[in-house]
From Swiss-Prot:
Its cofactor is Zn(2+). Coiled coil: none annotated. Belongs to the vitamin-B12 independent methionine synthase family. The gene is MET6. This is 5-methyltetrahydropteroyltriglutamate--homocysteine methyltransferase. L-methionine binds at I444, G445, S446, E497, D612. The modification Phosphoserine is found at S89, S242, S629, S706. It comes from Saccharomyces cerevisiae (strain ATCC 204508 / S288c) (Baker's yeast). Pathway: Amino-acid biosynthesis; L-methionine biosynthesis via de novo pathway; L-methionine from L-homocysteine (MetE route): step 1/1. The active site is at H705 (proton donor). Signal peptide: none annotated.
Length: 767
């Protein structure tokens, strides 16, 4: 009989209960026991929801207070020495590794000052994981038994679950060697790590687990030979052990075909494959399945919010049943549902027609179950009919098509994506306008979003204050930020973005073709959640979006103020995109909307315009090849279409987060100045790659995701390291990213120390 399965469910709670609890704990407002109770309540709620929906195979150990990869590092004792010396509790160690910790000594606790581990994008999603850091002194051992405890927790509720673990090869491959052990190959630690996996799996079996889901998402990457060999070695090893639960080897986000040789013949009970992202792999995967293995068909999209087409999905599952038999097929989500909002029923303000196009995590449970029942011959005719009508109505919807937008995209030519002169000719004109010192200082855009800002925005949205009152409040906040920047001596200022709720949502709300949720939160990292806008139809800008605030900010200072925009690729990648139009087309529509805004800012007297692209690397296809090179070409073109309509003397900036970007790809954007998140890299080789980069650059100097405050000496040391490989005359001094999530006191001190460090180097380079 065909079974239904879910690979993971959002951990945040329908009303962001996890965020409120973790931040409450960090701020000392709740105890650790109260935090743990919230976690237990959320897990219970998720398991019961899936059970009541009729899901056969329900995941456990998909919950985390911060990040599932970080949980594994704590479980296996992959904890760098800088954390262990403080004798923190396990949960405080977890949080210190994720976000850093800086606290003064008290009567009961000693002082702590430790930076966070590196945070990296989870494949091509907008989720971030905390990267495991290995050294030659890493000693694997079990710290607790979280997967077992959560399995038993569900068992007490009468719910039999399938525990989820990130696999050993993916865990090692996605990690890195510590800076003191750079010659260490993480995969060389596999033999030491496998016994710990076996120990956890044995404990799970003893607790009553009959099956486990082991995720090896690296199987959709271009794996080197040693990683493919590691897959064979790891799962052959598991197959040689006795009394372990059956293993479902799970992959997602792409095709496994290039790595099928590593998968064939493995002693695993089932293979899960993502047929949403890579339906073309079906025949080769089915041919590679062993005679007794089950195929888990990932057919309900774990990454996007569009309603499933039951007819198409059922056809794919039936094809698998024809090849393998019903007992060897599972209907599943393509990946964990972590990447989707929790429940569409919480959306009360969406247009009814548009709402009918969507399916959030809770609704996706029903989709998995309906498809399973349909292919099993059960009567779901009413559900199939309603689904078919919904799918058809979306294709005909008035919200989808705009002929004028399509015509404008078709008219894009090379001239529209080329600045009037090359950088070496633009630079002297810009220097004449700005007369900036060596080591110019700036920030990336946002300043702290205080409680007062959120309260007033909420009042305005509810209509309890007028537009005039709200504008007056926003202007007062802008003035505070401008005066602060002048006071500490920053060179190129920002207005602080107090009017913006989110860097994509703010613009999306002013662009035709977008839809927005009230409660469609998705975890980005830790307690940082986002509400991705939804691209429903063709995109266009009806009027100026940011000019008013930028003009006001520039009017109250003699220093240059940057106009701040979010780039076309980031607007695309940090939205739920359409699935009926290719992403290049959507990017070009956004580029044209932003081009109009850039030109309006310049016409209004804004001389520095920053178009942020923190998601540029995220959009890259996971595998090398023509798709990847094509992506870089059209992504760079979209940026240039947005920014190339300005005069030579107008300075274009851009910014990238979490990005291992090739300098040549950044060069293709032709921005005058770029800033890159860098504070947690400590990578001299990466700096050296930019030695011959022709334009100006700022490598981020402090981690804005951590409350920790770097000293002036730390800034000096970091800049000194950079200047060994990068020319001083091209270097800008800036933080990693925007300061929206930080408090004012830590912002004030960190930026003051940063400016003091820049002034120190100006003295050093005077002659």
């Amino acid at each position: 009989m065909v079974q239904s399965a879910v690979l993971g469910f959002p951990r945040i709670g329908p009303n962001r209960e996890l965020k409120k609890a973790t931040e409450g704990y960090w701020n000392g407002k709740i105890t650790v026991d109260e935090l743990f109770k919230v976690g237990k309540d959320l897990r219970t709620q998720n398991w019961k929801l899936q059970k009541e929906a009729g899901v056969d195979i329900i995941p456990s150990n998909d919950f985390s207070f911060y990040d599932q990869v970080l949980d594994l590092s704590l479980l296996f004792n992959v904890i760098p020495d800088r954390y262990t010396k403080y004798d923190l509790s396990p949960i405080d160690t977890l949080f210190a590794m994720g976000r850093g910790l800086q606290r003064k000594a008290t009567e009961t606790e000693k002082a702590v000052d430790v930076t966070a581990l590196e945070m990296v994008k989870w494949f091509d999603s907008n989720y971030h994981y905390v990267r495991p850091t290995f050294s030659k002194t890493t000693q694997f051992k079990l710290n607790g038994q979280k997967p077992v405890d959560e399995f038993l927790e569900a068992k007490e509720l009468g719910i039999h679950t399938r525990p989820v673990l990130l696999g050993p090869v993916s865990y090692l491959f996605l990690g890195k060697a510590d800076k003191d052990s750079l010659d260490l190959e993480p995969l060389s630690l596999l033999e030491q790590l496998l016994p710990l996996y076996t120990e956890i799996l044995s404990k799970l079996a003893s607790a009553g687990a009959t099956e486990v889901q082991i995720d090896e998402p690296v199987l959709v990457l271009d794996l080197p030979a040693n990683a493919q060999a590691a897959i064979k070695k790891a799962y052959t090893y598991f197959g040689e052990q006795s009394n372990l639960p059956k293993i479902t080897l799970a992959t997602y986000f792409g095709t496994v075909v290039p790595n099928l040789d590593a998968i064939k013949g493995l002693p695993v009970a089932a293979l899960h494959v993502d047929f949403v992202r890579a339906p073309e792999q079906f025949d080769e995967v089915v041919a590679a399945i062993g005679n007794k293995q089950t195929l888990s068909v990932g057919i309900v999209d774990g990454r996007n919010i569009w309603k499933n087409d039951f007819k198409k999905s059922s056809a794919i599952v039936n094809k698998a049943i024809e090849k393998l038999g019903a007992d060897r097929v599972v209907v599943a989500t393509s990946s964990s549902l972590l990447h989707t909002p929790v429940d569409l029923n919480n959306e009360t303000k969406l247009d009814a027609e548009i709402k009918g196009f969507f399916s959030f995590a809770t609704q996706k449970l029903d989709e998995v179950v309906v498809i399973t029942k349909n292919v099993s011959g059960q009567d779901v005719a009413a559900a199939l009919e309603a689904n078919a009508k919904s799918v058809e109505s979306r294709g005909k919807s008035k919200f989808i098509h705009d002929a004028a937008v399509k015509a404008r995209v078709a008219s894009i030519d090379e001239k529209m994506s080329t600045r009037a002169a090359p950088f070496e000719q633009r630079l002297p004109e810009q220097q004449k306008v700005f007369n900036l010192p060596l080591f110019p200082t700036t920030t990336i855009g946002s300043f702290p979003q205080t409680k007062d800002i959120r309260i007033n925005r909420n009042k305005f949205n509810k209509g309890t204050i007028s537009a005039e009152e709200y504008e007056k409040f926003i202007n007062s906040e802008i003035e505070k930020v401008i005066r602060f920047q002048e006071e500490i001596g920053l060179d190129v200022l920002v207005h602080g973005e107090p009017e913006r709720n989110d860097m994509v949502q703010y613009f999306g709300e002013q662009i035709n073709g977008y839809a927005f949720t009230v409660n469609g939160w998705v975890q980005s990292y830790g307690s940082r959640y986002v509400r991705p806008p939804i691209i429903v139809g063709d995109l266009s800008r009806p009027k100026a979006m940011s000019v008013k605030e930028s003009v006001y900010a520039q009017s109250i200072t003699s220093k240059p103020v940057k106009g701040m925009l979010t780039g076309p690729i980031t607007c695309l990648r940090w939205s739920f995109p359409r699935d009926d139009v290719d992403q290049k087309t959507q990017a070009m529509q956004l580029a044209l909307a932003l081009r109009d805004e850039v030109n309006d800012l310049e016409a209004a007297g804004i001389k520095v315009i920053q178009v942020d692209e923190p998601a540029l690397r995220e959009g890259l296809p996971l595998r090398e090849g023509t798709e990847r090179s094509a992506y870089y070409t059209w992504a760079a073109e979209a940026f240039r279409v947005a920014t190339s309509g300005v005069a030579n003397k107008t300075q274009i900036h851009s910014h990238f987060c979490y990005s291992d970007l090739d300098p040549n790809h950044i060069k293709a954007l032709d921005a005058d100045v770029v800033s890159i998140e860098f504070s947690k890299k400590d990578d001299a080789n990466y700096i050296a790659e930019f030695k011959n980069y022709p334009n100006h650059i700022g490598l981020g100097l402090f981690d804005i995701h951590s409350p920790r405050i770097p000293s002036k000496d730390e800034f000096i040391a970091k800049i000194s390291t950079i200047l060994k490989s990068y020319p001083a005359e091209k270097f800008w001094v800036n933080p990693d990213c925007g300061l929206k999530t930080r408090g004012w006191e830590e912002t004030r001190l960190s930026l003051t120390h940063m400016v003091e460090a820049a002034k120190y180097f100006r003295e050093q380079y005077k002659n």
